[in-house]
Amino acid sequence: MTARAPLPYDFMPPVPSFTLRSTDVADGQMMSDAQVFDGFGMTGQNISPQLSWQGFPAETGCFAVTCFDPDAPTGSGFWHLSLLDVPASVTELATGAASGDLSGLPAGAFCVRNDYNVKAFGGAAPPAGDPPHRYVFAVHALDVDSLASQGLDASVTPAVAGFNLRFHTIARALMIPVYGH
């Protein structure tokens, strides 16, 4: 068995944390079929989980919401969601808000392509027989009102979004459910 990959935020400067909750997923617990990919031999529903957060800094300009699998056998992990420019007044995403046609997203928010090459949430799909993978859901409180004002749009990659998050995150909330089959 190989060692577990580190979490991506282990390599970034520490920032304060705040509270992240969900009615659909839980820290350290197995995700349901609702959050599993529909494809790659999987028959899940590919629905983004409900997420809500509180306790972030008052000076937050906007949020970014990401989901990353550090255990994917790619050498670089796997991005399942990169949602940018969630307004600072929004503290919850409903179940399915970042799925399908994205009609549940707040005004101004946008997704960049995930590693399935889709501008939406892409569910879990670890290889059969792998130990359960970790899915790092993160809500990043940012010091700018929008990343679009910094030149980002829906055409950037998750890596470019992450590069910008590195320099604008003032606090971060994490929840890490797992999935394996």
Model-flagged regions — what are they?
Residues 1-181:
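N-terminus-centered regions that define maturation/targeting leaders and the start
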